[in-house]
Amino acid sequence: MADKPDISEVSQFDKTKLKKTETQEKNTLPTKETIEQEKQCEA
């Protein structure tokens, strides 16, 4: 591999070939309160 990246492929890139996708909401981590409540229910 060379030290410098090969830009020839990037310059030939065609944005019109990309497909439009629907973005989905990411799963958020539970809060500390939620974790504590779940632990109490299990015990």
UniProtKB/Swiss-Prot annotation:
GO terms for cellular component: cytoplasm; cytoskeleton. Coiled coil: none annotated. The keyword Kinase does not apply. Residues 1-43 are annotated as: Disordered. InterPro entries: Beta-thymosin, Beta-thymosin_sf. Residues 1-25, 33-43 have a biased composition (Basic and acidic residues). It is found in: Cytoplasm, Cytoskeleton. GO terms for biological process: actin filament organization; regulation of cell migration. PROSITE patterns: THYMOSIN_B4. Its main location: cytoplasm. Keywords: Actin-binding, Cytoplasm, Cytoskeleton. GO terms for molecular function: actin monomer binding. Pfam families: Thymosin (PF01290). Belongs to the thymosin beta family. Plays an important role in the organization of the cytoskeleton. Binds to and sequesters actin monomers (G actin) and therefore inhibits actin polymerization. This is Thymosin beta-b. It comes from Cyprinus carpio.
